[in-house]
């Protein structure tokens, strides 16, 4: 303790942008995306939904939303969290097909995701598993950005950010890509 001293600690280890390239998102088309998965470990679980929107000048240009058949029953905790059921996934395309479609749809556009490390880990795992090439898109992580800009907030969950920033929020749909 140093009495009479005010100290600010800044965590310079926060990764906000992965595979950084020069982009100005204000005048560039970019993709906001999210994934839903069978669990929390990219090595043993897989994606069951990829959802995304292409945005330019704050306008949605296009949407991508595909469910994926994991060919195994979902854990109840995932159904409870996402409201995605086995019946909804049965007969949908496989993870390799949907991942390839998504990557083709994105092209070389920069990506934005909340808690991007999670989504990136599943994208990288799918690319490796299905020989789709290296996943090296530029990705901006809004959760890391919020941690850096607002370290005093109680947490940096999407629900907290939307409330603090006065952004409309649908509690029932937040765990759907």
Model region roles, listed by residue range:
Residues 1-33, 54, 116, 133-139, ...:
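Phosphodiester-processing cores and adjacent nucleic acid-binding clamps
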Residues 26-136, 151-171:
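Conserved non-catalytic scaffold segment of RNase H-like nuclease domains
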Residues 173-177:
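Short glycine/threonine-rich catalytic loop with a Thr-x-Gly-x-Asp
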